[in-house]
Amino acid sequence: MTNIPQPLEPTPHESYALFYETVNIGEQLGHLEYRVTEEMLHKYCSTVEYWQSGYVNLAIREFHQVLSNKYGHINLTSCSRNDYYYRPPIIDRRVQVSGWIRDKYISDGIQYLVVGTLAIDDIGTEILKTQETFSLGINPPLHQSIADVESQPIQQLPALEKRIEKHTWNLFKHFNSEFEIGDLEPMTEQETGNLLAFTYAHELLTETYGMNFLKGGLLNVVFCNSLLPDQTCTISAEVNRISEISERTRTDLKILVKRQDDVLAASGKATILIPSPIT
């Protein structure tokens, strides 16, 4: 009797290529729902020592969740994140997050996905619109910056220094599972460090601009090298441009997040309108 050979398991590269061909630009990814509890918000804010945020969404991997709801677990590397803030979520309201594939492309042989999400609460209040770019697989950092344009700064904001304690690191790594939000595996070390870098950039802008940033602010960050636990990092920002738009002042900034070894962890740009266009 002839033994019929078993088909070979696809290599990771082949699996990513198959997945990349499967997804379509504009494809809807379904929804994620969760309730914002006082315990959830308190634990998030107290752990990162950042009480003004209100956006517990920053610790919830909404974009990962809507993608895995449809396609299961996929190894992804965060490359950049672009947030537009409407209003911080209100305690005890349910949040519904819808997701879709905004774009996909190949660069230097690596496949990229752009996932968009929109979070609203149970009475239709818009909370947060996010666009996240991922490379498929576990890949090295991009080693590029979106904040490297040479320009003479108008103003330098006071720098923010943060100590990354282990309990802060672990909270972000396991936040979804601790509060039973969706069904995701814990974040990788790289993803945890990237998300903390984004959160700290958000904190610096909130400390400076308050509700003018939390309602109507735009933050766009590229991840370069992950932050590390049990270390400090420094977040700096400088104002590059101030202009007048329809009786509002528009402020454009450049942001850098650096590790204690002076390695660039993330760089970004932000835009704030004063007064905020969102009431």
Language-model regions, residue ranges each:
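HotDog/MaoC-like acyl-thioester-processing domains
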Residues: 2-24, 86-167, 229-279
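Hot-dog-fold acyl-thioester-processing enzymes
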Residues: 2-79, 139-218, 277-279
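Structured beta->alpha junctions
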Residues: 33, 225-227
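Long amphipathic N-terminal alpha/beta scaffold segment
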Residues: 70-76, 86-89, 227
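Short structured motifs
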Residues: 16, 79-86, 100-101, 218-224
